[in-house]
Curated annotation (Swiss-Prot):
Assigned keywords, A-Z: Disulfide bond, Glycoprotein, Lectin, Proteoglycan, Signal
GO cellular component, one term: external side of plasma membrane
GO process annotations (BP): immune response
Domain C-type lectin: 93-223
UniProt cross-references to InterPro entries, sorted A to Z: C-type_lectin-like, C-type_lectin-like/link_sf, C-type_Lectin_Receptor_IMM, CTDL_fold
Signal sequence bounds: 1-19
UniProt protein name: C-type lectin domain-containing protein 87
A molecular-function term among this protein's GO annotations: carbohydrate binding
UniProt keyword Glycoprotein present: yes
UniProt source species: Caenorhabditis elegans
Disulfide-bond pairs as recorded: 114-222, 193-214
Length: 233
């Protein structure tokens, strides 16, 4: 009963609380320095079998858990020059640039929006990256990240899939209920998509990750990783 009351209390804040985003980590906006090229993290804790460079893409979003939107055939993203700056308004961490989306979107539209920006939804390759970027999200709201546990994979995999390879083991991030169990963290046949909540409180445990229905209108975080984008050429 205590758990249910907690969720019921949090959900209204999803749409009723309005606050300007603040940051506890100083990340420079487009600094003029090129994102450095580095090999993808090879993590022995990778939770699922490596399938392709993408662990999932827009073609996987055509199930009943996602909103019904059209996905035109996609071409490989345009070449990103290694001497290029992060675009205006983007944040930099290591070899990636990040966009904090201020429009409320369903998960599938958020993924398409990131693709149109030559990026993916945010995929954390380390706990340092996770902690640095999630605090940049809009305060007192949830933001979509590139982490999904698809209904059609549930019998094969307990852990959710990051959108791209080489990512942090998802059990390491700040789930609401630990140790990580999908059902205890909101997962269901319709709630396949993970979102990160940025609490206005300075208390670290007040911010967390939770599964929500993929049709919910949330903010989102895009990541343009120079290694990933250029490897897809």
């Amino acid at each position: 009963m205590r758990f249910c009351l907690l969720v019921a209390f949090i959900l209204p804040g999803l749409f009723l609380v309005h606050a300007a985003p603040t940051s506890s980590t100083e990340l420079p906006e487009a600094s003029g320095e090129a994102p450095e090229t580095s090999p993808l993290v090879q993590n022995d804790e990778q939770p699922h079998q490596r399938l392709t460079f993408y662990n999932w893409d827009y073609k996987d979003l055509g199930t009943t858990a996602f909103e019904d939107i059209s996905f035109p055939a996609r071409q490989p993203p345009a070449f990103v020059n290694q001497t290029e700056k992060c675009p205006d308004g983007w944040l930099r961490f290591a070899d990636s640039c990040y966009w904090i989306e201020k429009e409320l979107l369903g998960f599938a539209k958020a993924e398409r929006n990131c693709f149109e920006k030559q990026s993916t939804l945010f995929v954390a390759n380390s706990i340092e990256e996770w902690d640095a970027i999630r605090v940049q999200a809009k305060e007192a709201f949830f933001s979509w990240i590139g982490l999904v546990r698809f209904t059609h994979y549930e019998k094969l995999e307990q852990l959710p899939r990051w959108q791209t390879e080489g990512a942090l083991n998802p059990t390491k991030i700040n789930w609401l209920i630990k140790p990580y169990k999908p059902l205890f963290n909101g997962w269901s046949s319709l709630a396949n998509c993970a979102a990160s909540y940025k609490s206005p409180s300075s208390l670290e445990s007040a911010s967390y990750t939770y599964f929500y229905p993929c049709t919910y209108m949330l903010y989102s975080i895009c990541e343009r990783n120079s290694t990933i984008v250029n490897a897809l050429q």
